[in-house]
A protein has these predicted regions:
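Conserved nucleotide-sugar phosphate-binding/catalytic loop shared by glycosyltransferases and other
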Residues: 2-7, 12, 30-81, 274
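A short, glycine/small-residue-rich beta-strand->loop->alpha-helix junction that serves as a flexible
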Residues: 10-22, 230-234
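Short amphipathic alpha-helix
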Residues: 18-28, 43
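Leloir-type glycosyltransferase catalytic cores
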Residues: 80-83, 336-381
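Donor-nucleotide binding loops and adjacent catalytic segments primarily
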Residues: 172-173, 186-293
Length: 381
């Protein structure tokens, strides 16, 4: 009997879209699906490392670049709109050909607007139903366009918790929602086990007394997790490496540049610090446990992955990236994290202020395989 097959493709707008798909793909594999992943570059490298049994198909990404200065980002993205439109058309045509060859039973797109097929159940994954832009008029206009486009998909799956106790505020819980069926999936984290019961929360499935247990001799002051499009990825990497070495404290920085051949490649080190290109999940968990503070962009997937470890979080949103700026402000208001603008960030000041900051624990409801089964059944009704 032929196994059901699924083709899934995450957008290449930061590694988070790929890493959050790992949990979902593993769940599909447990349900007996043959998984095909359409991607390229860094995303392919990190997914191949985590998912050796999946089949990979080459699909070019959007290849978006950011501005060096935040105030330029809207203009830089505006000039890339033709490239984005071309990518949407290209991926749509690519999928029509791939569907004729492989005959997928289900298609899942993580924020790729052209990755759907009219004859096959097609799911769109996003936590941004209300994308925050620099102007309110632009926010409303984009939401109308997005909702109209989402009608081409069978359903929308949202990696968050429905209602007031959510992680992304109005991004995933807007006042007005799309007309297609929605499923709030819970939190996707490749660093924790997927639960098997719909109502389980992470505290019910993980022993918090052991998840943060570490050897004090290996403790570091901070772990810097770098990600996102260039040139901002490199700018943050250099900022954290230089500032950490100036303070002469133990720390680790992960550059967010995975390699197919060297998943745990060490770029450079000295007596106090290490800079890795990327760390596989077990090694990443080890460094998270060792760190007193985690410094990162505050991208949504990173937040989902870090919550179970109950670490003190410091965000440096990508300049001009309104989603991360919104999440940083929201999480700081709830005392879940500290947030600093990159142009004003001073590592010594941030670490001093973090000592006196009253950090609180963000809520976390785990993604569930049983809920996934129910969501799949809804697609075929």
């Amino acid at each position: 009997m032929k196994r059901p097959s699924i083709c899934i493709s995450p957008i290449d707008w930061g590694l988070g879209h790929a890493t959050r798909c790992i949990t979902l793909i593993k769940a599909f594999e447990k349900l007996g699906y043959q998984v095909y992943i359409a991607t390229e570059g860094y995303h392919e490298a990190i997914l191949r490392e985590a998912l050796p049994s999946a089949q990979f198909l080459h699909l070019r990404g959007y290849r978006i670049r950011y501005a060096k200065w935040g105030f330029n980002l809207p203009l830089v993205l505006l000039f890339q709109v033709p490239q984005i439109i071309y990518s949407i058309i290209y991926e749509y045509r690519w999928l029509q050909k791939a569907q004729a060859q492989y005959k997928f039973d289900l298609i899942v797109s993580d924020n790729r607007f052209g990755f759907y097929h009219k004859s096959v159940p097609s799911v769109f994954i996003t936590h941004q139903l209300n994308l925050q832009m620099h102007f309110e008029l632009a926010t409303r206009l984009f939401q109308k366009i997005q909702y109209a486009w989402l009608k081409r998909f069978t359903a929308c799956w949202i990696p968050d918790i429905e209602g007031a106790h959510n992680l992304s505020g109005i991004l995933a819980n807007p006042k007005h929602k799309p007309s297609i069926p929605l499923w709030y999936m819970g939190c996707l984290s490749r660093l924790v086990e997927t639960t098997t019961h719909i109502n389980d929360t992470i505290k019910g499935s993980i022993n918090y007394s052991t998840i943060n247990k570490t050897d004090s001799n290996e403790s570091i002051v901070f772990l810097g997790i770098v990600s996102g499009p260039e040139p901002q990825r490199t700018l943050l990497e250099n900022l954290l490496w230089k500032a950490g070495n100036t303070l002469d404290i133990p720390f680790v920085v992960i550059a967010g540049t995975p390699s197919k051949d060297q998943p745990n490649k060490l770029i450079k080190e000295n007596k106090n610090a290490k800079l890795y290109a990327h760390l596989a999940a077990p090694e990443l968990v080890r460094e998270i446990k060792h760190a007193e503070y985690i410094i990162c962009r505050g991208g949504y997937t990173t937040l989902m992955e870090l919550i179970p470890f109950e670490k003190k979080l410091i965000f440096i949103p990508t300049p001009g990236q309104t989603e991360q700026m919104y999440l940083g402000k929201l999480w700081e208001e709830k005392n879940w994290a500290l947030c600093y603008a990159q142009e004003n960030f001073k590592l010594n000041i941030a670490l001093e202020e973090a000592k006196d900051f009253h950090f609180k624990q963000a809520p976390f409801k785990a993604f569930s395989i049983e809920a996934l089964e129910a969501a799949i059944k809804q697609l075929t009704l």
